[in-house]
């Protein structure tokens, strides 16, 4: 920062975008190998390289922001715009799944029996595990807001407490979703109902796992005093992402579990 006369961060060459792209290729190819040939070797290599990339990329960003002071207010403003655009792209991603669901359910074809849910499909009761999942995610939305306000007010321990509760609720949601999948009376191959249900809720579940990972990183950073009341964009981005995951679940619950059943 001492050798430049502007507030922007000139990023050093980094291998992580390349290794991230390679891990994405390995994971998608590995999924195809797993589905068609029951081999998980390529998938495991992809997951390993993805985990290593995430760890090292996060480490570099933390070093640049917390220890080298590259994240000036101008840089943080750019990062905020980037996060907003990323969340908008995620909204459009899920819009595709809702479009597929409503396209199939509002005008069911004769092949589906002319009704929704299709003939032979027994949907899950929206007042059982799905309602509990909704309560869990809404509670986590409250606790992440509590953590954010505690951080802005400089209350370190209440922030850690609230963040830990949020992470615990996120993990609990994932376990509930896994048990629901295990006990579901239909599969992803049971026509358009199974496909839209498992792809939409499955991708949401993946986003919950990503969000939980993001929050775990923030928890350990807070333990090491990385955040201050006016310099905590890493946590702020995680909180925005978590609220997005909350809102998507509400739409999923109302559309697929409640109305769709």
From Swiss-Prot:
Write out the topological domains of type Mitochondrial intermembrane: 35-40, 106-128, 184-190, 257-261
Q: Which UniProt keywords apply?
A: Membrane, Mitochondrion, Mitochondrion inner membrane, Translocase, Transmembrane, Transmembrane helix
Query: What SUPFAM superfamilies does the database record attribute to this sequence?
Result: Cytochrome c oxidase subunit III-like (SSF81452)
What reaction does this enzyme carry out catalytically? 4 Fe(II)-[cytochrome c] + O2 + 8 H(+)(in) = 4 Fe(III)-[cytochrome c] + 2 H2O + 4 H(+)(out)
- Gene Ontology CC annotation, any one: respiratory chain complex IV
* UniProt keyword Repeat, yes or no: no
- The enzyme's first-digit EC class, named in words, is translocase
Looking at the UniProt entry, the stretches that span the membrane are 16-34, 41-66, 73-105, 129-152, 156-183, 191-223, 233-256
Query: A single GO BP annotation from the record?
Result: mitochondrial electron transport, cytochrome c to oxygen
Which ranges does the record list as Mitochondrial matrix topological domains?
1-15, 67-72, 153-155, 224-232
Q: Where in the cell is it found?
A: Mitochondrion inner membrane
Q: Name one GO molecular function term.
A: cytochrome-c oxidase activity
Superkingdom of source:
Eukaryota
> Is-annotated flag, keyword Transmembrane?
yes
Membrane-topology descriptor:
Multi-pass membrane protein
EC number annotated for this UniProt entry: 7.1.1.9
Q: InterPro entries this protein is in?
A: Cyt_c/ubiquinol_Oxase_su3, Cyt_c_oxase_su3_dom, Cyt_c_oxidase-like_su3, Cyt_c_oxidase_su3-like_sf, Cyt_c_oxidase_su3_a-hlx
Q: How does it assemble?
A: Component of the cytochrome c oxidase (complex IV, CIV), a multisubunit enzyme composed of 14 subunits. The complex is composed of a catalytic core of 3 subunits MT-CO1, MT-CO2 and MT-CO3, encoded in the mitochondrial DNA, and 11 supernumerary subunits COX4I, COX5A, COX5B, COX6A, COX6B, COX6C, COX7A, COX7B, COX7C, COX8 and NDUFA4, which are encoded in the nuclear genome.
As for what it does, the entry says: Component of the cytochrome c oxidase, the last enzyme in the mitochondrial electron transport chain which drives oxidative phosphorylation. The respiratory chain contains 3 multisubunit complexes succinate dehydrogenase (complex II, CII), ubiquinol-cytochrome c oxidoreductase (cytochrome b-c1 complex, complex III, CIII) and cytochrome c oxidase (complex IV, CIV), that cooperate to transfer electrons derived from NADH and succinate to molecular oxygen, creating an electrochemical gradient over the inner membrane that drives transmembrane transport and the ATP synthase.
- Tell me the protein's name: Cytochrome c oxidase subunit 3
What organism does the UniProt record list as the source? Raphicerus campestris (Steenbok)
State the gene name recorded for this protein. MT-CO3
């Amino acid at each position: 920062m001492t050798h430049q006369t502007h507030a922007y961060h000139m990023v050093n060459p980094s291998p992580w975008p390349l290794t991230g792209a390679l891990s994405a290729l390995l994971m998608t190819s590995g999924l195809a190998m797993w589905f068609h040939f029951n081999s998980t070797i390529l998938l495991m290599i992809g997951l390993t390289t993805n985990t290593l990339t995430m760890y090292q990329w996060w480490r570099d960003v933390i070093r640049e922001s917390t220890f080298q002071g590259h994240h000036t207010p101008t840089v943080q403003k750019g990062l905020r715009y980037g996060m907003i655009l990323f969340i908008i792209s995620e909204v459009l991603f899920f819009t595709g799944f809702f479009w597929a669901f409503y396209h199939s359910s509002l005008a069911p074809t004769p092949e589906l029996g002319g009704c929704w849910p299709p003939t032979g499909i027994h949907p899950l009761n929206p007042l059982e595990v799905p309602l509990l999942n909704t309560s869990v995610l809404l509670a986590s939305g409250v606790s992440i807001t509590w953590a954010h306000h505690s951080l802005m007010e400089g209350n370190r321990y209440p922030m850690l407490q609230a963040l830990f509760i949020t992470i615990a609720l996120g993990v609990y949601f994932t376990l509930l979703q896994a048990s629901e999948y295990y006990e579901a009376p239909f599969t992803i191959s049971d026509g358009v109902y199974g496909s839209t249900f498992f792809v939409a809720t499955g991708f949401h579940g993946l986003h919950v796992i990503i969000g939980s990972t993001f929050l775990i990183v923030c928890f350990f950073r807070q333990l090491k005093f990385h955040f201050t009341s006016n310099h905590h964009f890493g946590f702020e981005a995680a909180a925005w992402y978590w609220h997005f995951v909350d809102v998507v679940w509400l739409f999923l619950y109302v559309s697929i579990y409640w109305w769709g059943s």
